[in-house]
Each structure stands twice: as structure tokens, then as C-alpha cells.
A protein has these predicted regions:
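C-terminal tails and terminal domains of large nucleic-acid-associated
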Residues: 275-278
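Protein-protein interaction/assembly regions in multi-subunit complexes
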Residues: 1-273
Length: 278
């Protein structure tokens, strides 16, 4: 019988990093379970990202903003790095307006009750001219995984001057797994899994672990509904064996694949069919 796992241990936990240990994993299951958890953690959890932006006076990404050190392409790269925690299911807008020579960071974004800026120190742009100004509007959405701008389906046309971005929604930035042997009872080949989970700070890493477990369990539960019950299969198999056994008992000794000498001996003892041997 395959034993169940032991209790999960949280070795360390911060807002953006956790180390989780799973003991008593059945031999050989460590890599299987660890890789499955890693894939789900990196690809299947919901997060928030900038999906598009508009700059006042800019028509496309190849434009130049007077007095701004970065071009619009570099600006878009900076915006993709920003991380947010969004509390609503709706698309959120957030703005920043700046004048004069200064460095603009995510901390300068206007306050929004539904949006928490996780990376306030990340740079957005640098104005080098005292007379320069920048008016910027960001669109922030929730999503799963990495979605290219051209793959994103829109229900309505975007305003002129809107620049769409490829969006990395995943709140998990890194997952490292290690598997080692441990002793359970008298066996020394059971597995111990250690998971190191790093997030962008918008999702607690232990909560990310629990969400990934939930996703895997839902997937396997869905599969279970399409598979015949093991007990039913076992019962059907038993009946088939019994029926086959009864058929064999009905075979006449003369037709059985045995030697003529054995047939003569059995016939002498009045054994006519194989069932008489019981």
C-alpha cells in the first residue's frame, strides 16, 4: 500500500519568500510531485500587471517625449516591471502627472483604493528638462500566466494612442525544488521535498503553495469523474476469472491437453471432466 505524506513544514516565511518541506513522500514520488507543483506555481496563479498605457501627445511606441531621457520603448519596459496587487475584478486605471526635472518612480502614481503598488521604488521615467512634463495613464488587469499583447482579446476598440504590452501576470518569480532521501520506519528510500518559493510580494508564498495544491487537486478530481471505479474493475475482473475457471472445469478429460497415459489413468478412476478433479 502506498503511504500518505506526512505533515507539511514551513521552514521560513516572509512576504516574498518561503521554504516549505514535505516529508514522508513515497519512494520515487519526490520529483513527480515537486515538478508538478513547480509548474503550477510558475504558470497558473492569478496576478496583476500593466496591459497598456497612454502618454499625452504620443501616438505610438516609436515616438519621443520632449525632455524625457527614456524613449517610449524603454518606458514600456519599465512599466512591464511594475508589480501591483489589485483587489477588484475590474480593469483599473492609474495615472501619474509630473513636471520639471525629476526621476519618476512607481511611488508617484496616483492613489487608487483598488490598487496597491508593490514596487514603489521601481523607476518609470526621468525628466531632464525643467520645462518638461509627463502625463501617463496605465491600465492594470488581473490575469494568469504570460499573455502576448496580440493574443489578448478586446471587446471594444482602444483609444487612439494606446500602447499595448505583453503582460506577465504570474506573482511567482522563482521556484526551486530539491529532493533527498529520508528514513521512514525501517526504509531509507522515502523522499523529502524542499520547495523554495519567491513571489513579487503581491501574494504570500505559502498562500501560493496552497493555491497550487488546490489547482492540482481540482484537475485530478475532474479526471476521476471520467475513470471507472477501481473497485468495479476489480469486481468485473474477478467475475471473468471465475467464469473462465468454470469453463475449464467442463472440458472432457479426453479433450484436455494432457498425455494419453494420463487420460487412461483418469478414465480408469472414472474422472470424465476436469471438474471431477476437485
Amino acid at each position: 500500500m502506498i503511504s500518505l505524506l506526512q505533515k507539511t513544514k514551513i521552514l521560513s516565511n516572509t512576504p516574498s519568500r518561503a521554504i516549505i518541506q514535505i516529508d514522508g513522500v513515497y519512494p520515487g514520488y519526490g520529483i513527480t510531485l515537486g515538478n508538478a507543483l513547480r509548474r503550477v506555481l510558475l504558470s497558473s496563479l492569478e496576478g496583476a500587471a500593466v496591459t497598456s498605457f497612454r502618454v499625452a501627445g504620443v501616438a505610438h511606441e516609436f515616438s519621443v517625449v520632449p525632455g524625457m531621457y527614456e524613449d517610449v520603448i524603454q518606458l514600456s519596459l519599465n512599466l512591464k516591471r511594475l508589480r501591483f496587487k489589485v483587489f477588484s475584478e475590474e480593469v483599473e486605471k492609474i495615472r501619474v502627472a509630473a513636471k520639471g526635472a525629476k526621476k519618476i518612480t512607481a511611488a508617484d502614481l496616483d492613489k487608487n483604493a483598488q490598487v496597491e503598488v508593490i514596487t514603489p521604488d521601481y523607476p518609470i521615467a526621468t525628466l531632464t528638462d525643467p520645462k518638461a512634463s509627463l502625463e501617463l495613464e496605465l491600465t492594470i488587469e488581473r490575469g494568469i500566466g504570460y499573455i502576448l499583447a496580440e493574443k489578448r482579446k478586446r471587446k471594444e476598440k482602444l483609444p487612439i494612442g494606446t500602447i499595448e504590452l505583453d503582460a506577465n501576470f504570474s506573482p511567482v518569480t522563482r521556484v526551486n525544488i530539491s529532493v533527498e532521501n529520508m528514513m521512514v520506519g525501517e526504509r531509507t528510500d522515502y523522499n523529502r521535498i524542499k520547495l523554495e518559493i519567491d513571489t513579487d510580494g503581491s501574494l504570500d508564498p505559502v498562500e501560493a503553495f496552497h493555491q497550487s495544491l488546490g489547482i492540482l487537486m481540482e484537475q485530478f478530481q475532474a479526471l476521476r469523474g471520467d475513470v471507472d471505479s477501481p473497485k468495479v474493475k476489480e469486481q468485473e475482473s474477478t467475475f471473468a476469472v471465475l467464469e473462465k475457471r468454470e469453463d475449464i472445469k467442463a472440458i472432457p478429460v479426453s479433450e484436455a491437453k494432457i498425455s494419453a497415459r494420463t487420460v487412461n489413468v483418469l478414465t480408469k478412476h472414472r474422472i470424465k471432466i476436469l471438474g471431477d478433479l476437485d
